[in-house]
């Protein structure tokens, strides 16, 4: 598969997958998740995966405008995207046999929040924030967020995120236990990149 929305690059034993729509803050059309899922089936011996976003954002959420869903009925198209593309990709990450590290700067919103937190490790810069804004547009959290968030940060804090639809800055997310220690923006990629090889070099069961 030729990739239009992501970059896939091997760095030693680490497969680096970069959401590559910086002009849209890496807003993710359904096809992007097809590409991610395809890339995850092509580890070719990689022992860790690093997820990142090009530019100043990790992922600003699903791109549902401009015909991205490709259907006249938004409800049916959204359901199809969730069941055929978004959710299967989240399950593919959960079932992957190697560690996944996400490197977050700027927004990790909506499905982008779920994608970041689905990783085994989430490295967040000082500019990062996490957002569940579905309540503001009359939708429910997607990408497994309603299952994942209560288990990461507890029911009350998950409810606060999902019912208020407010940004959770990196420092607050750290206090809540959502991710490892915050790092400076310029160090985010270095730390995330270092974690990938470290996990890749760890021993495995024969």
Predicted regions and their residues:
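Glycine- (often His-adjacent) and acidic-residue-rich active-site loop
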Residues: 45, 53-92, 108
């Amino acid at each position: 598969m030729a990739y239009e929305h992501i970059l896939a690059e091997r760095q030693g034993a680490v497969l680096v997958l970069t959401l590559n729509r910086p002009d849209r803050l890496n807003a993710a059309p359904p096809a992007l998740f097809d590409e991610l899922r395809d890339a995850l089936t092509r580890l070719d011996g990689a022992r860790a995966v690093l997820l990142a976003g090009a530019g100043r954002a990790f992922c600003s959420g699903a791109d549902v405008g401009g015909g991205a869903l490709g259907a006249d009925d938004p409800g049916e198209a959204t359901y199809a995207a969730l069941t055929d593309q978004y959710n299967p990709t989240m399950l593919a990450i959960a079932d992957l046999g190697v560690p996944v590290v996400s490197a977050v700067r700027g927004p990790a919103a909506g499905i982008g929040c779920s994608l970041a937190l689905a990783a085994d490790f989430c490295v967040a810069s000082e500019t990062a924030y996490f957002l569940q804004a579905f309540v503001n547009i009359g939708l429910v959290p997607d990408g497994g967020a309603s299952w994942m968030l209560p288990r990461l940060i507890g029911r009350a804090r998950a409810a606060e995120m999902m019912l208020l639809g407010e940004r959770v800055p990196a420092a607050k997310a750290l206090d809540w236990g959502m991710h490892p220690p915050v790092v400076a923006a310029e160090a985010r990629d270095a730390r995330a990149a270092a974690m990938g090889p470290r996990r890749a070099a760890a021993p495995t069961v024969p």
